[in-house]
Amino acid sequence: MKNFPTHKYIAVLTGLVFLCSVTAVLAHPEDKGRWDKKYSTEVYLFGEKPIPFLVDNVHLLPKGKVLDIAMGEGRNGVYLATQGFEVLGLDISEKGLTKAHKLAEKNNVTIETKVVDLENFTLEPNTYDVILCTYYMQKDLFKQFESALKPGGMIVVETYNIDYLKYARFSRKWALDTNELLDIFKGLRVIRYQDYDDGKEAYSSIIAQKPE
């Protein structure tokens, strides 16, 4: 990964000591402030349970190193840790990642986290067995996923698609076009793909594998 100047914070959470690596300089401090404010509550903003698509398909994923992009409060990454994966979570919000560690402690697992500005981040090639990214849209980063996977590694991506605009005030730039995930990850072998629309939400999900 890109070498950012970092320093370490040691925090104690009800008996658990963990290391959270924090970048010294963030290019988008306004984003950090906005998400830190959102996560500054005891309640988990998006709940503690993982997304169903991940639970339903976890048996397909190769065991090993997971990179959880935009981890937030950790519901998906922590779930994978309970399933025996080694999890590194990245997010711009230190407060969100602190809650992720609390959730990991609650589930008797450990995770590693790093505070980064994903809009100025480069993934290390051939490093991860699984790359997980849910409800975070950054297409230039998506394009790095294939090279960052080990041969045989898989991506798991789920986020809102254009039909979601029917149900919520939501910026068009954060919504996928129809079948866009299939186009973005056309170099990978599609294992699972779905478009979901229940009349309240609409999103697309994909699991795809890098060739051996």
Residue ranges of each PLM-predicted region?
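A short, conserved alpha-helix within the catalytic core of class I
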Residues: 137-149
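A short acidic, Gly/Pro-enriched loop at the edge of an enzyme's catalytic core
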Residues: 121-130
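Conserved SAM/SAH-binding beta-strand->alpha-helix loop
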Residues: 93-95
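Core SAM-dependent methyltransferase catalytic element
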Residues: 196-212
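Conserved SAM-binding strand-loop segment of SAM-dependent methyltransferases
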Residues: 107-118
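Conserved beta-strand signature within the Rossmann-like core of class I S-adenosyl-L-methionine
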Residues: 153-164
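Conserved class I S-adenosyl-L-methionine
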Residues: 64-72
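Conserved SAM-binding motif I beta-strand of class I
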Residues: 86-91
